[in-house]
Amino acid sequence: MQQESTLLDKIDYPADLRNIPLEKLPQVCKEVRNYIIDTLSGVGGHFASNLGVVELTVALHYVFDTPKDRLIWDVGHQTYPHKILTGRKDRLKTVRKFNGLSGFPKREESPYDLYNTGHAGTSISQALGEAAARDLTKGEDYSVVAIIGDASIATGMALEAMNHAGHLKKDMIVILNDNYMSISKNVGSISNYLNNIITSHFYNHWKRVFYTFLKWLPIVGPAAERFFKKVEKGFKDVLTPGGLFEDLGFGYIGPEDGHDVIRLVNMLAKVKKMKGPILLHLITQKGKGYDPAERDPIKYHGVTPFRKEDGAMDSGDTSKIAYSKIVGRMLSILTEANPKIAAITPAMIEGSGLKEYAEKYPDHLFDVGIAEQHSVAFAGAMTNGSIIPYMCIYSTFLTRAIDQLVQDVSLMNLPVRFVIDRAGCVGPDGETHQGLFDLGYLLGLPNMDVFVPSNGQDMIDSLRWMETYDKAPIAIRFPKANVDLKTLDFYKEVDLRPGTFRVLKRGTDLALLSIGSMIDEAKKATEILESAGFSVTLIDLIWLRPLGVEALNEELSNVRRFVIIDESYVDAGASGYLLNRILPENLSKYVKTFGFPPEPIHHGERKEIIQAYRLDGASIAESVADVLKKNLIKP
């Protein structure tokens, strides 16, 4: 029996959507939502946030002439409905997979994706830039819409952009998708009535006529205009929560139900005609339409494949623990013994493994929101108050606070403990989340010490050792990976000597200098080279600063060639720093650095990406063997 055709089957692009009668849009939304649930239950991906914006996405593409009209998504992990409606429906099953769809908007994928996104707070700046460019270009006429969440709109960048937009008074729309931290409650039917009035063409037209008339009145005109504007604003402020946005120069509408697609279409059609910057405040629900995700949107923010009937996900290998979970557990142990310890995170309690720590020591955890610049300066100041701050942050987000790293920590030599998660290749989140820059800038900072654990016990030992280290700021950086729990001892005495490294094997033909997370691939390369008859030294560089230069040069004096293996960009990692210190005595011995080339590193599983860039053990061994043979170094 042939399956009955659905409305979604008829929609490949927004032009097809606009041919659907308005009254059938709720059915379209239902089908889009079911398609997301059906697909992601099999492949995983960002889930709850996408279920929460189905009606909004359908309404936007129904009202606006995309891609001529610009839709700009903040962060972008909520764009699966957008991808479904813009020609990528059949590829959603490949999302976040190697050579598949990105989990975020991506310019190379579609003309409907204006910007590659992944970090928060950028959309309003981009929307304002689009509006300014439009108005400087003769003959251009298109709408610009930024869609931003309630967490992102509190970022400094978003507020800076709103301040500028209020000054420029460009025609643009900001849609506030409020799905977690409600700014204010809807006051009911009066608010709805007012919103209907202020979005009407009639109201806005005669308001402009009225104020123009007042300006022409001699003597009393300007004063009367100011008076009536204050009355209008005051009446609106009493009944609706938009005072802050009005003060920034935005016309405010809301809060509105973000799941009433027909009302949204009618509202957006009116807002589209309004002049100046407009903010439309929508209340939505993460996980909308799927009970488990509605009950626990944090758990279902990002999912692995799950059982559609009840949302059950594989609990994973219980014999392993994530590096980030080690952080939370170890900080709990340390704080129990030392009340001066504090943990700081920019809106990443779950991701940074701090959930249990937050429950156990709520007064010692400071979640500063999406405010990386503030978080670093805040941590630096805590050291001045004799507190021991552990700044827990993803590598990709620390780049947002480089100025504070320089000015507010390293130049003053303040002993902040930086715990840098997701360093190196992070896999499915793709180019905007890869942690490939941190070693380049950390090693260029005055006073900053850098430790790169190569296993879980190193991680534990460094967290404990850092507690009493107050001579300088220090950073430890570690991958998004799991380690065997049974190999870990959270209470052992620490023997961590700065400037040391481990010599795991000694040979005479070649030395592999492995940095942190690349140790496993370096071990595989060593085994392959030794099986081919080469004599190999394998060095595990766990301390980059301070670096044991004399001891390292001593080891290199016993080999004929050496290579560096670093899970960073070749030109922005540790190799330049290392070579400046060891090349003077080993110039003729250097072969190459294995790392990523200076290009965006796309999404996929870490193993797939490592292999694609020939950074796996087998590829390293093959490349090195070829070089050795060309240099007449034979096994």
From Swiss-Prot:
Any coiled-coil ranges, and where? none
Name the NCBIfam families for this protein.
Answer: dxs (TIGR00204), PRK05444.2-2 (NF003933)
**UniProt EC number:** 2.2.1.7
Which PROSITE patterns does this one have?
Answer: TRANSKETOLASE_1
Task: Fill in the subunit field for this protein.
Answer: Homodimer.
Q: Which GO terms describe its biological process?
A: 1-deoxy-D-xylulose 5-phosphate biosynthetic process; isopentenyl diphosphate biosynthetic process, methylerythritol 4-phosphate pathway; terpenoid biosynthetic process; thiamine biosynthetic process
Put simply, this protein is called: 1-deoxy-D-xylulose-5-phosphate synthase
Entry cofactors: Mg(2+); thiamine diphosphate
Q: How is the cofactor bound?
A: Binds 1 Mg(2+) ion per subunit.
The UniProt entry's GO CC annotations, sorted and at most eight, read: cytosol
The organism of origin for this protein: Leptospira borgpetersenii serovar Hardjo-bovis (strain JB197)
**Record keywords:** Isoprene biosynthesis, Magnesium, Metal-binding, Thiamine biosynthesis, Thiamine pyrophosphate, Transferase
The record ties this protein, via HAMAP family, to:
DXP_synth (MF_00315)
Binding sites annotated in the UniProt record for thiamine diphosphate: 77, 118-120, 151-152, 179, 290, 372
Family membership noted in the UniProt record: Belongs to the transketolase family. DXPS subfamily.
Concerning SMART domains, the annotation shows:
Transket_pyr (SM00861)
Residues given in the record as Mg(2+) binding sites: 150, 179
- Signal sequence segment: none
Q: According to its UniProt record, in which pathway does this protein act?
A: Metabolic intermediate biosynthesis; 1-deoxy-D-xylulose 5-phosphate biosynthesis; 1-deoxy-D-xylulose 5-phosphate from D-glyceraldehyde 3-phosphate and pyruvate: step 1/1
The protein's role, per its UniProt record? Catalyzes the acyloin condensation reaction between C atoms 2 and 3 of pyruvate and glyceraldehyde 3-phosphate to yield 1-deoxy-D-xylulose-5-phosphate (DXP).
Q: Which Pfam families match?
A: DXP_synthase_N, Transket_pyr, Transketolase_C
Reactions the enzyme catalyzes: D-glyceraldehyde 3-phosphate + pyruvate + H(+) = 1-deoxy-D-xylulose 5-phosphate + CO2
GO MF terms here are: 1-deoxy-D-xylulose-5-phosphate synthase activity; magnesium ion binding; thiamine pyrophosphate binding
Q: Tell me which domain of life the UniProt entry assigns to the organism this sequence originates from.
A: Bacteria
